[in-house]
C-alpha cells in the first residue's frame, strides 16, 4: 500500500478541507446578497465567472503538474479563491479583468509556490493588487448604490456591460452614471480621500449623496453582511478570534485617536469599520490559515498590524482602501512573527 508523506503541521480536525472551504464560501452569502442588492447583478455574474475560471485554471495546472484532478478540485480551495476575488472586483468590470485576476491567483500566487498550503501570500489579494496596479481605471470604476442611479441597470444590461462594454442601448458604465450628483465612479473611501486633498472638511465631504449613512450608501450593509458571516465562522470554530478581533480593535483605536485630535481631516472609527473591505478582510481574507500567523500571540500581532496598515494606507497611501496591501505586507512578516511568538517547548527553559 502506498502512503502519502506530508509535511507539518499535522493538524487534525473533524471537518475536512472540503467542508471547511464550503462553509467559508457559504458564510459570504449575507455580504454577497447585500452587495448584489445595492450594486446590481454584476456582482453575481463576476462571482460565477470567477468560480468557473478558477476551477478551469486549477484543472489546467494540475494537468501540467500531472496530479489527479478529482481530489484537488473537490477541496473547494479554487472555488473560494475565485469567490473572494470576485467580491473585491467592481461588479461591472470587463470579463477579461476577472479572468486575468483569477488565473494569476491560481497559477502564480498559489501553484507556483507548490499549491494549497504552500503559498506565502493570500492568492486572492495578490491577484487583486496585480489587477489594481495594472488596470487602475477598471479596478476603480464602481457604480454608486442603486438609489443614486438615474438609469436602471437590468440583468441583461449587466451581462452586456461585462462582456461587451456597453448596455443593450449602447451606453457605457460612465454614460449610465453621468447624471448622478456627486462623485459617481468612486467608493466612499475614494470620495473622502479626494475631498480631503481638495481642502474640504470631513463634514463637507460626508454631506454628498453617496454618504446617506455614516459609512456610505450600501457599503454599511455590505459590511454588516460580512460581519454576520464572520460571526458564523467564529461560532463554527472555522477561524480563530485573535486575527479579526485584533484587526478591528487596532483599526478602531488608531482611527479614534486621529478623530479626536484632527476631526476635520479624519473620518470616524465607525466609518472605517463599516466602509470598503473592512469586514471582508477581517473575517475572510486575513484569517487565511496558510498565509497568516500560526501562534495565538502571533495572530494578535498579525491582526493588529493589518489594522494599523489599513488605516495608514487609507489616510496617507495612494489608494483609497488598503486591505489588500495590508494583508500582503503582513504576510511578509509572518515568518518573523511566528519565530518570536512560538511557544516554549515543554520541559525547556525560555531563551
From Swiss-Prot:
Q: How does it sit in the membrane?
A: Multi-pass membrane protein
What is its EC class?
translocase
Q: Which residues carry this modification: FMN phosphoryl threonine?
A: 187
A single Gene Ontology CC annotation of this entry is: plasma membrane
Which cofactors must be present for this protein to function? FMN
Instruction: Tell me where it mainly resides.
Output: membrane
For this protein, what is the EC number? 7.-.-.-
Against InterPro entries, the record matches this protein to: NqrB/RnfD (IPR004338), RnfD_bac (IPR011303)
Does the UniProt entry include the keyword rRNA processing? Answer: no
Q: What transmembrane ranges does the database entry give?
A: 37-57, 88-108, 123-143, 214-234, 241-261, 270-290, 300-317
List keywords of the entry alphabetically: Cell inner membrane, Cell membrane, Electron transport, Flavoprotein, FMN, Membrane, Phosphoprotein, Translocase, Transmembrane, Transmembrane helix, Transport
Say if the entry is tagged with keyword Secreted: no
Compartments where located? Cell inner membrane
Q: Give GO terms for biological process.
A: electron transport chain; transmembrane transport
Q: Name one Pfam family in it.
A: NQR2_RnfD_RnfE
Per UniProt, subunit arrangement is: The complex is composed of six subunits: RnfA, RnfB, RnfC, RnfD, RnfE and RnfG.
Role of this protein: Part of a membrane-bound complex that couples electron transfer with translocation of ions across the membrane.
Matching NCBIfam families: PRK00816.1, rnfD
Family, similarity comment: Belongs to the NqrB/RnfD family.
Protein known as: Ion-translocating oxidoreductase complex subunit D
